[in-house]
Amino acid sequence: MLLIEGLDEQVDPWIHEVARALTDSGVEGTLTGAPAVGPPRWAQLLSRDARWLTASIGFRTSVGPGFKPSRGWAPGPAARDAVVAVGMRWLTAHRGDLMAYTGQDANFWVDAATASTLLTDDITQSGNALSGSYHRTRQDIRHISTTLPSAMTLSSKTADCPWQQTVDELRAALLGAPLDLVSIAMIGYRGMTTYLMADVPGSGAYDRNAYEHHPERWDEFVLEPSGIQVLTDRHLAHAHDLSGWSTTRLDGDHVLVEARDLEPWYATARRPHESPDPDLLDQARRDFGDIILTPRRAQQLGL
């Protein structure tokens, strides 16, 4: 796919040049074009308040300590393929219209096969990928995105949808990922991008810079408790007291950890810069204990 921008008198010669080059190379076929588009008006209005429920998955990496996110996607092709598989299931579940956001910042309506190909290519080339699904009748918007160095986020915004339904769908999506590739997963109104990139209330309680540059430790630490998360046995070894939480063993290394009452965590829609009830979050932090990568803990570990 080529992205060409400009006036007709500028664009047409380039198109003819591409056609000649393809012909000279023995390629046969037809060049087709499509205009760049933006999200439909109803979707822009629906997403204006920015209260999105998200599920984030951090993948195991094969890189050493001190990985620089600018180097691209850290986990490798198996995790990349898992991102695409999980992401496409998420986007197509409600049969909405698919939009690809290419690495060149141009958006196009595409079919599922093209969306899958573009996600794969963008993750391979830069590590950053984004696609969306829009269902006008359901007033439903879904996104799948990646965050360097090794995370993906599924997001959902549906008009008048009970929070329980969205949480159930996000939980099912998380548990559909191949757990042998997963370091950490969680559901909340903040996605991994917000945790790693934004200075939000409560971010002083964790070291996001150390976390971003050490994805090899994601299977040992989290930045903040969520109402629902998938943790590893390495996480649990650092916990203070999870007796007040519901825990479900998923495999030999992963455990689903959920608050016994999910309503305080999810019933009230929040923007990314808004936090749950302070008392609720403080108690969760005490329960999680050294699972949280605090600035002091990061300094002790030399991260």
Stretch-by-stretch model annotation:
Residues 1-95, 190-303:
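C-terminal interaction module
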Residues 58-196:
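Internal, hydrophobic cores of structured domains that mediate oligomerization or house catalytic pockets
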